[in-house]
């Protein structure tokens, strides 16, 4: 693997040790390259003491075992207050407003590359921080850019679009140069306890709990009607916030007379009437949009693409890039028109833009353009 920096000797890197395989191997690779490496474990959520399985305690144990094996120091820090104020409150407010937020993106913005970086700077005297994210950093243009990870299936640039070039310049991403299978192989060869630990999925503060049960403890749900796009009432929902555009499972409808066998999808949410609108088929006209408006913009280079730029966009993680044209509607609002209509574009989610391998930045989808 190419060295991340020509002369890493003596430079101090604080690695965000999560107790997973990616951060474990990141620490090892940086040591191999001659960096002075220390780990930092973040606790971002205060679990209920009644939780049968305390994930954070298990993760800390694994992080400590890896650091012991590598012979490096592990620090710990509690960011639960910062997480609550900057990530969780936002998450609840968005759901309350009928949108579908992405807390992982907000966590990267406010915690992993802000609170963590400040702590590493002020308390641990770091030259760099490092994370186990599958992205790459390039300094070829004279300014740090973020590129997609080599492993297209694990690329996490979508979740990191809020980073500025200054933050990227202070960050190292060793596993971004590797395939996931290679990362597990390295961990196995090194005898790291995390080599076969399964990847964490879902939202960290929900853990193993059912999403609807978790949300119900914080937000009062208001049941209402489920209607077809033609206005026929065909069922009841337990709360609009439990549903997202394009959702197919968990609607509790089916076997309708006079309907074909195509599955039902959520095609709209009528907030004023508290009605969930459904239609049949993944390409239902109400599910399709030709574009969208977005705001809360973040550009990695702080200026963004040119007005009228022809680039590509992802409107959700793991989606294939879609060719589009971007135009500005003021300082903090853009209009995006797809080359081809796209299904299930969802307000509250992030739209992330690319020029080839380079992640340019993105914004929050505000409203859809249907035709």
From Swiss-Prot:
* Principal subcellular localization: cytoplasm
Q: What is a biological process (GO) this protein takes part in?
A: tRNA wobble position uridine thiolation
> One GO term of the cellular component aspect?
cytoplasm
What is the reaction catalyzed?
A: S-sulfanyl-L-cysteinyl-[protein] + uridine(34) in tRNA + AH2 + ATP = 2-thiouridine(34) in tRNA + L-cysteinyl-[protein] + A + AMP + diphosphate + H(+)
What EC number(s) are associated with this protein in UniProt?
A: 2.8.1.13
Q: Which GO terms describe its molecular function?
A: ATP binding; tRNA binding; tRNA-uridine 2-sulfurtransferase activity
Protein name per the record: tRNA-specific 2-thiouridylase MnmA
Q: Which organism is it from?
A: Shewanella loihica (strain ATCC BAA-1088 / PV-4)
């Amino acid at each position: 693997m190419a060295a991340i920096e020509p002369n890493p000797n003596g430079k101090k890197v604080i690695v965000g040790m999560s107790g997973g395989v990616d951060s474990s191997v990141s620490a090892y690779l940086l040591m191999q390259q001659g960096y002075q490496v220390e780990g930092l474990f973040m606790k971002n959520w205060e679990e209920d003491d009644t939780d049968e399985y305390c994930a954070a305690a298990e993760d800390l144990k694994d992080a400590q075992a890896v650091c012991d094996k590598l012979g490096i120091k592990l620090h710990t820090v509690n960011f639960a207050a910062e997480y609550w104020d900057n990530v969780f409150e936002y998450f609840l407010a968005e759901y309350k407003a009928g949108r579908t937020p992405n807390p992982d993106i907000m966590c990267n913005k406010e915690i992993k590359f802000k609170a963590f970086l400040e702590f590493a700077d002020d308390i641990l005297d770091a030259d760099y921080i490092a994370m186990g994210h599958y992205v790459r950093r390039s300094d070829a243009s004279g300014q740090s850019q973020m590129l997609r990870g080599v492993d297209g299936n694990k690329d996490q640039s979508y979740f990191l679009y809020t980073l500025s070039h200054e933050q990227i310049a202070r960050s190292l991403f060793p596993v971004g140069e590797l395939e996931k299978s290679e990362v597990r192989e390295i961990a196995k060869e090194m005898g790291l306890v995390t080599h076969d630990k399964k990847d964490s999925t879902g939202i960290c503060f929900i853990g193993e709990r059912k999403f609807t049960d978790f949300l119900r403890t914080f937000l009062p749900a208001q049941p209402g009607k489920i209607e077809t796009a033609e206005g026929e009432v065909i069922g009841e929902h337990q709360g609009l916030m439990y549903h997202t555009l394009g959702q197919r499972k968990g609607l509790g409808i089916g076997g309708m007379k006079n309907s074909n066998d195509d599955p039902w999808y959520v095609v709209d949410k009528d907030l004023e009437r508290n009605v969930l609108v459904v239609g049949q088929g993944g390409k239902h006209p109400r599910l399709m949009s030709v574009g969208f408006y977005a705001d809360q913009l973040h550009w990695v280079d702080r200026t963004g693409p040119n007005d009228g730029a022809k680039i590509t966009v992802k409107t959700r993680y793991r989606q294939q890039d879609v060719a589009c044209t971007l135009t500005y509607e003021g300082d903090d609002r853009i209009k995006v028109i797809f080359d081809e209509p796209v299904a299930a574009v969802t307000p509250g989610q992030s739209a992330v833009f690319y020029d080839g391998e380079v992640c340019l930045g993105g914004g929050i989808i505000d409203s859809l353009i249907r035709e």
